[in-house]
């Protein structure tokens, strides 16, 4: 082994001072204040980033909930709107049906009105014809005046008010008539039937001054005994005289001053027949 070989080996065995110097400088850099500050800043930034991500996640969750709620509200509003639209459609359909029914009703009423108008026109024509007939009939005289009852040769009027015998006589005279006079059994039967509906007394044209005098009619003719018998106070004497009235088919005598209904009688106008 030569000297040069030992030198070379010695050189190889010596440590690399430059490399060790670099390592020492690197460790010294790691423990420098600037590196610690940078690491702390980076940690704070990472922590802030994590917090930001968490906050954003929470906000995203809230936004998602709001979107879900809003979607639910929109769905509810949609259903509500659909229900309103459906109700409106049903209302329109019902309105259309009502309108159709109303049209049919109007058409029916119009048809009935037309029919009624035709009937009214026919009735109007019939009324005109009836008026013409009444005019022709009016030119002919009736046997008895209005409200009088015709029987045989006479007309009879039954009064609606009660008066004494003398006042009743005046009433009949004002009507160009006299109080009732019965000339036959047929007349008696007719009067009895005519007043059978009533229980009131009716004055007749039969009277006498006192019991010693005969019963006389207004025209002075005497009562025929076979027609009827006068009942009641036939033997009584009254200052105003005794008069006869008919009630329930029988004839009675009474004070002429008392009030009763009356029956007027006059001749019928048979020339119109």
Curated annotation (Swiss-Prot):
Keyword Disulfide bond: yes
Coiled coil: 64-123
Subcellular location: Cell membrane; Membrane raft; Secreted
Region (Disordered): 1-22
UniProt cross-references to SUPFAM superfamilies, sorted A to Z: C-type lectin-like (SSF56436)
Extracellular side of membrane: 58-273
Database matches in SMART domains: CLECT (SM00034)
Region (Neck): 58-150
Location of the C-type lectin domain: 151-265
UniProt entry tagged with the keyword Cell inner membrane: no
Domain of life: Eukaryota
Disulfides per UniProt: 144-155, 172-264, 243-256
Posttranslational mods: The intrachain disulfide-bonds prevent N-glycosylation at some sites.
Outcome of substituting residue 193 to L: Impairs binding to acetylated LDL (AcLDL)
Induction: By inflammatory cytokines such as TNF, IFNG/IFN-gamma, IL6/interleukin-6 and by pathological conditions such as hyperlipidemia, hypertension and diabetes mellitus. Up-regulated in atherosclerotic lesions, by oxLDL, reactive oxygen species and fluid shear stress, suggesting that it may participate in amplification of oxLDL-induced vascular dysfunction.
Tissue: Expressed at high level in endothelial cells and vascular-rich organs such as placenta, lung, liver and brain, aortic intima, bone marrow, spinal cord and substantia nigra. Also expressed at the surface of dendritic cells. Widely expressed at intermediate and low level.
UniProt site (Not glycosylated): 183
Description of its domains: The cytoplasmic region is required for subcellular sorting on the cell surface. The C-type lectin domain mediates the recognition and binding of oxLDL.
Disease: Independent association genetic studies have implicated OLR1 gene variants in myocardial infarction susceptibility. OLR1 may be involved in Alzheimer disease (AD). Involvement in AD is however unclear: according to some authors, variations in OLR1 modify the risk of AD. While according to others they do not.
Protein name: Oxidized low-density lipoprotein receptor 1
């Amino acid at each position: 082994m030569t000297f040069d070989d030992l030198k070379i080996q010695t050189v190889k065995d010596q440590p690399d001072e430059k490399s060790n110097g670099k390592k020492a400088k690197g460790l010294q850099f790691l423990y420098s204040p600037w590196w610690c500050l940078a690491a702390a800043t980076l940690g704070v930034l990472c922590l802030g980033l994590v917090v930001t991500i968490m906050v954003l996640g929470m906000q995203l969750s809230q936004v998602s909930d709001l979107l879900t709620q809003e979607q639910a509200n929109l769905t509810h509003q949609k259903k509500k709107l659909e229900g309103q639209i459906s109700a409106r459609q049903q209302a329109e359909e019902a309105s259309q049906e009502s309108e159709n029914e109303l049209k049919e009703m109007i058409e029916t009423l119009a048809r009935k009105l037309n029919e009624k108008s035709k009937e009214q026109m026919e009735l109007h024509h019939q009324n005109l014809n009836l008026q013409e007939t009444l005019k022709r009939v009016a030119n002919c005289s009736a046997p008895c005046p209005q409200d009088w009852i015709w029987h045989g040769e006479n007309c009879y009027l039954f009064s609606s008010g009660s008066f004494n015998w003398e006042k009743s006589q005046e009433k009949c005279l004002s009507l160009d008539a006299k109080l009732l006079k019965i000339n036959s059994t047929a007349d008696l039967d007719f009067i009895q039937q005519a007043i059978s509906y009533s229980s009131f007394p009716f004055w007749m044209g039969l009277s006498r001054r006192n019991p010693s005098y005969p019963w006389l009619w207004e025209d002075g003719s005497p009562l025929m005994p076979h027609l009827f018998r006068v009942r009641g106070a036939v033997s009584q004497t009254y200052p105003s005289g005794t008069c006869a009235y008919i009630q329930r088919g029988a004839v009675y005598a009474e004070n002429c001053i008392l009030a009763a209904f009356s029956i007027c009688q006059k001749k019928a106008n048979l020339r119109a027949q």
